[in-house]
């Protein structure tokens, strides 16, 4: 299943680059988990992008339901760990985005990109 996720992440990374974003890291891991894509947009905002790749017929609204409050907490903790390890990005504003990718018959496409899908306040 990792292969499917990798393909979805590649689609999103390529799309972000067309939006003039700089990819800072992909599949960055720490004890809290993995950050799929970390990018910086043209305005200097650091984007922590969670990518969910699903087939056309799925049970969790194209992966959106998989971004539970518990998952959001882990992503926030991982983002904090990334920023601690990369001090040059600590003063930049940050955003948590979700990218939903669909695949069907070997074709992958970005179905929906949710900018600022959740915030620190949304999980309290």
From Swiss-Prot:
Q: Name one GO molecular function term.
A: nucleic acid binding
Q: Which domain of life is it from?
A: Bacteria
Report the SUPFAM superfamilies cross-referenced here. Answer: Restriction endonuclease-like
Record-stated family = Belongs to the UPF0102 family.
Q: What name appears for this protein in its UniProt entry? A: UPF0102 protein tll1737
What is the organism field in this record? Thermosynechococcus vestitus (strain NIES-2133 / IAM M-273 / BP-1)
């Amino acid at each position: 299943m990792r292969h499917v996720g990798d393909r979805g992440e590649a689609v999103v990374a390529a799309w972000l680059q067309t939006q003039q974003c700089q990819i800072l890291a992909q599949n960055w891991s720490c004890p809290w988990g993995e950050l799929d894509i970390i990018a910086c947009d043209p305005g200097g905002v650091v984007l922590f992008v969670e990518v969910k790749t699903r087939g056309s017929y799925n049970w969790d609204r194209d992966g959106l339901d998989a971004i539970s409050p518990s998952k959001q907490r882990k992503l926030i903790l991982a983002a904090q760990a990334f920023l601690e390890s990369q001090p040059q990005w600590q003063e930049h504003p940050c955003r948590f985005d979700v990218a939903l990718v669909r695949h069907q018959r070997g074709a992958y496409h970005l179905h929906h990109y949710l900018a600022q899908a959740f915030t620190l306040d949304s999980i309290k």
